[in-house]
Amino acid sequence: MTSRLEKFYKEEVVPALMKQFGYTNPMEVPKLVKVTLNMGVGEAATNKKILENAVGDMTKISGQKPVVTKSRISVASFKIRDGWPIGCKTTLRRHKMYEFLDRLINISLPRVRDFRGVSGRSFDGRGNFNMGVKEQIIFPEIDFDAVDAIRGMDIAITTTAKTDAEAKALLAAFKFPFRN
């Protein structure tokens, strides 16, 4: 069972990028490797219920249970100790990755207030894209009335592209809404 975006990649994106960049082999075309979701919850150091709610939200959004991240060092100004749980993360690959990106591009990002597109400067120089979401309530899986607090998350999209231009062309071919 392939998702709609995965089928679109094979039928539309690969031929378009082969023509645009002059690739001779379809295996040269950049592809998506993984999508990593990270939610830092600093308040979890004092209240464990907050972390449980964050894990529940991320489970609904991603479709799989996230791993609880723990602090590596003690920081007195943040009032955290080494080994305390401070967030959660999950990595999506294959079908779940394509389904998540489909929901992100077509449903969630248009629900952001005053949305003008995502910044095209958020590439890391090696063909990977990072973005942040300020509210988890933009995802349709989250019930607005059941949310205890508004939390943001980081989304990292890892590709096999060698340059930022190739990665931007790949994401633009997926109809990713870039501002510039």
Swiss-Prot record:
The keyword RNA-binding applies. GO terms for biological process: translation. Keywords: Ribonucleoprotein, Ribosomal protein, RNA-binding, rRNA-binding, tRNA-binding. One of its GO terms (molecular function) is tRNA binding. Belongs to the universal ribosomal protein uL5 family. This is one of the proteins that bind and probably mediate the attachment of the 5S RNA into the large ribosomal subunit, where it forms part of the central protuberance. In the 70S ribosome it contacts protein S13 of the 30S subunit (bridge B1b), connecting the 2 subunits; this bridge is implicated in subunit movement. Contacts the P site tRNA; the 5S rRNA and some of its associated proteins might help stabilize positioning of ribosome-bound tRNAs. Part of the 50S ribosomal subunit; part of the 5S rRNA/L5/L18/L25 subcomplex. Contacts the 5S rRNA and the P site tRNA. Forms a bridge to the 30S subunit in the 70S ribosome. This is Large ribosomal subunit protein uL5. The gene is rplE.
